Amino acid sequence: DIPKDVTTARCEYAYPASVSMRSYNPVLKGHTGQIRKALALLMEAKRPMIYTGGGVVLGNASAELQQFVRALGYPCTNTLMGLGAYPATDPQFMGMLGMHGTYEANMAMQHCDVLLAVGARFDDRVIGNPKHFFQEERKIIHVDVDPSSISKRVRVDVPIVGDVKEVLAEMTRQLSALSQKPDAAALKAWWTQIELWRARDCLKYDRTSAIIK
């Protein structure tokens, strides 16, 4: 803490002749080889999940996210900070994730075998205890412009450092050129399970007018 009399005191400031500041030069384009590895994992997935956060909103990458998710046909969820990045009325949208999120989003997150995280932090409100969330058989792909955010809370199998808008666009381009397609039978079974979780209608409550709620 700094005493109030110090913060309100007036003084003469000697300006330096020059100022040298280390600038921040983020990597914008994702590594092509890493993107290729990520797509290979996504093609082999039996229970895929796409988990997006506020980085998609800040990166103005909603259009790129929608194009990529729809091309795959995989389920997608947003964190609180990522709401609005994907249309809430889209059938592939699972609702918000985390302690205040939907049952189906949280169950799919916990049971997926390949997880693509885009502009998200793996916050404790989303994954709970990292030790319990981590599973050897679950493969995690993490896209983020900040390299310090990758493998910060959970171990990541395929890190991709880059601007989410650029990376998602490149992933879509590479996806369209692939001869391999998602496992249709496995994906159908996965969506069947998701619909069972969704059928619980977790946000529903008794709307009787007898009691003010």
Segments and roles (model prediction):
Residues 1, 73-80, 141-144:
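Short internal beta-strands
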Residues 1-41:
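Conformationally flexible catalytic loops at phosphate/diphosphate-handling active centers
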Residues 2, 14, 20, 40, ...:
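Phosphate/pyrophosphate-binding active-site segments
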Residues 8-15, 60-64, 87-92, 126-130, ...:
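Short acidic, glycine/serine/threonine-rich loops at helix termini
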Residues 2-7, 54-56, 122, 147:
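Glycine-rich beta-alpha junction loops
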Residues 98-149:
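Phosphate/diphosphate-binding loops
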Residues 23-29, 88-101, 153-166:
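Short beta-strand elements at the ligand-binding edges of bilobed clamshell
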Residues 30-31, 37-115:
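Anionic-ligand anchoring segments at beta-strand to alpha-helix junctions in alpha/beta enzyme folds, i.e.
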